[in-house]
């Protein structure tokens, strides 16, 4: 029996031991054969996944190491992003796990080469796999053989000398968190004080700064939070202004959850970037066209967020708005959007209106059974934010749902609600109508980066469309689609993302 790991009693690794032993006996493979060539040499990629892929891993592995096994469809997608080169690049798998990504890379490279033993050994020699979990590294040595470099270490403590030992490609699905999971809004049972540590940004930084050669490629599957542009870590700025994005493909939290069989819930992106230079445009995957299209990064000083669904319809909307801005010499500045904050501690709330709690506030907005938007209210002993101001309130966490408060009757008692202040009744009604259209809802969807919450980045494109000089038609969706020069196919796609219908 070939022992994998120090703790053979661990169920997962005991199964792997049995699987390896059975396969070797069935195919008359000796230990020397496997040690020299690696077990992967004797397996097809499909066989490798059927033997070793486990969609569900232990809670300890997931929370302590941040380990998640990457499904084959996603791995193939990542490998397809890599440039085709005649020479064999040096490749680093930064958090190898059980070697799924490296195995797919090696087999893909092998299939496009002369299938000689020498070529296989050369591919293996070009690979370096780093993995913190020692049980996994034992299995990696068995799978990849003695020609590959397998390092049992923390990737963030790995510092190769770039001039001699740098890598042409760094690839991987880095751990998102380690030492415990990160609390998300939907998890009501976890205390944020018990949070683990988010490390995926550090993996990106470390790969670029300390592992890649100049003009080397980074191919990662990571959360897409950096794409909205206001990340405190500065990753958006670093990626776009110090490196060149080659292509990206975004995945919604629902699609990610589907890929990982219910073991993921994060909006993610596969990104291929090239070290050095500056990003001016890149290939952006359109879920509308099911293909890549060119995305131009130069959207003006107020536009930094990168869309997630597609850039084709977004480009048409942007082109139309920019043309009327240029024609009439209007401001390119987005309409002013205010995001509510947490109430001061001195403000107390009640579900009932009393003499001590006279001020009425909006908590949130919801859909009623008949499809009309309804509001949940409470009362406070002090006026809450925006009380007394004429405004448009977007109180629904996912869709906004424009609510007019022309008299300024309501305050806002919850954080993360969006407010537009405007005294002109006609203009604010026009904006309210526009923000309830399928087109506006689609644009909101195109700029969502965490769960399904409405983001402030989703308003960067929104200029003051109520300005009569712009000439936008109000009250007629078909006329609006025509004004933006959308095709019937465009319109159909936009409508499919309108999950709720609004009533005047």
Model features per residue range: what roles?
Residues 1-120, 128-143, 458-502:
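Class I S-adenosyl-L-methionine
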Residues 3-6, 10, 194-198, 425-426, ...:
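Structural motif
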Residues 59-64, 91, 185-190, 412-420:
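Glycine- and acidic
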Residues 64, 73, 100, 198, ...:
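Short, well-structured alpha-helical interface segments that form or flank functional binding sites
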Residues 70-77, 95-106, 121-124, 132-138, ...:
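Signature of N6-adenine DNA methyltransferases within the class I
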Residues 89, 168, 391:
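Conserved acidic residues
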Residues 124-128, 417:
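Short active-site oxyanion
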Residues 255-493:
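C-terminal substrate-recognition regions of SAM-dependent nucleic acid methyltransferases
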